[in-house]
């Protein structure tokens, strides 16, 4: 497999636009390029991706790697495309199976160490993905609580690139306790807990 497509999403004001991240790996002068009406922070993600993969234990092959974002007429902003780019590249070089990314949306920022960081707009993105026929979403662990508000869609909240690879290769997923703790805490609070309320 030298080509792959991963579903993701972008916020356009208050609206959500589904975005498709394509990765093509071919012979030629080693190069990593990204195209498709990208903001500076999205263009910079190629360096985060390369370094994060290295620190996760995966060295990109010395080939021409092209990342394309569809549709081209939508301006891609923010760092939430880091994780789908990683997923697309890993699929294109054969680290994760293509079938695992079918009907799956991927959103998330990554650090240079390979950790996955939270992004804004997860709730509307997951809701729109469900409306478009997506059956599962891979999101940052810290976004799990809001993602789980959308029912009848599988949510995989990951803390690292390594965990995403594990899940996409059929590994066991253990739901984080983050959302449950937040929900429990919210139920326990009442007005007497707020200073000045009696």
Spans of features found by a protein language model:
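Peripheral, non-AAA+ core regions of ATP-driven protein-machinery
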Residues: 1-198
């Amino acid at each position: 497999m030298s080509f792959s497509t991963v579903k993701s999403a972008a916020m356009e004001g208050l609206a959500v636009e589904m975005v498709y991240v394509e990765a093509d790996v071919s012979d030629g002068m080693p190069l990593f390029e990204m195209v498709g009406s990208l903001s500076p922070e999205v263009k910079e993600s190629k360096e985060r991706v390369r370094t994060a993969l290295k620190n996760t234990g995966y060295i990109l092959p010395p080939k021409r790697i092209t990342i394309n974002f569809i549709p081209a007429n939508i301006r891609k902003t923010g760092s939430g495309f880091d994780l789908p780019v990683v997923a697309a590249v890993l699929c294109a070089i054969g680290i994760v199976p293509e079938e695992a990314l079918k009907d799956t949306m991927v959103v998330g920022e990554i650090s240079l160490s390979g950790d996955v960081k939270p992004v804004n707009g997860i709730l509307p993105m997951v809701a729109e993905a469900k409306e478009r026929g997506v059956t599962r979403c891979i999101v940052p662990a810290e976004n799990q609580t809001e993602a789980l508000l959308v029912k009848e869609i599988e949510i995989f909240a990951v803390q690292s690139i390594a965990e995403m690879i594990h899940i996409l290769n059929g590994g066991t997923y253990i739901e984080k306790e983050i959302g449950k703790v937040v929900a429990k805490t919210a139920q326990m609070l009442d007005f007497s807990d707020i200073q000045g309320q009696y």
